[in-house]
Amino acid sequence: MRGQSVIYYSPMDLYYFFVFACFAFGLGCCIASFLNVCIWRLPRNESVVSPPSHCPKCNARIRWYQNIPVLSWLVLRGRCANCHEPISARYVMVELLGGVLFLLAYLQWASGFFLRTSPLLGLQPFADIWTVPVCWLVVSGLILGSFIDLEHF
């Protein structure tokens, strides 16, 4: 391995890398949860602000602790807490997709920042920190447009 330099990272560097990766995934799931509201309501010309989230079958209001992305769907086993009717798996799939895509955008930037090379998909690492939020915005728009198209047209 002559001629190659080895980069060592402190445990704190790896800790921050992991914390920010978890943050990116969680943020992606939360944004995608809101996108689910938009996917359902925008084609119907309904407000995305009010009324609050509710079951599409019985119209029972969904409480805040039943509205946690991915986890609530799993805890409730994909059913409404009130009427026990099935809730579409699309909701959790969109949330997971948002989380994974936000995580991949962060890892693409972080791999260049921490590792100085980008093993992910062989792409060049992102140049600056503002690129990641822009990628997140683009990903959000693509998820919204794609699922509205799949669901309603």
Give the predicted meaning of each segment.
Residues 3-152:
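A membrane-topology feature that recognizes alpha-helical transmembrane segments
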